[in-house]
Amino acid sequence: GTGGVSKSILLGLKKLKFKNIFISGRNFRNTKNLALKYNVKFIEWDQRENSNFNILINATPIGMKPLTTSMPVSKNFIKSLQCVFDVIANPKETKLIKTAKDLKIKNQGGYLMALNQAAIQFKLYTCKNPPIKEMEKSLRRNMI
């Protein structure tokens, strides 16, 4: 993807000194521009499974309601990965994450990212420490 989450992820990966970062997205121009801006490798969307990498971070809406039966890559491609992260928080377990779990590949859904974003915003707006446990209970209770 090429939205704000993608940009944050790219900055984080760069800060952590990750090498060989690839980006792919359905919008050729936006993705190519993002790759140039952050000095990462660009892969055309229809070539994404012809590349060799270990970690997949899905920052597209593919898998989010109402596209819950879709994945950004095939099950066969997921088998080659060491780790899968999906930024989507709803549904809590996307098809991508469920597939990675079934294949015994390390994985993390966007649920915790959403919770941590909410906690940071709470502190930013209230100048108080967020009630993380209560926030998580509420999120679990209301998550579909």
Give the positions of each predicted feature.
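Short, hinge-like loop/turn segments at secondary-structure boundaries
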Residues: Y38-F42, Y125-K128
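Conserved S-adenosyl-L-methionine
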Residues: G12-N20, D102-K106
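NAD(P)-binding Rossmann-fold cofactor-contacting core
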Residues: L16-Y38
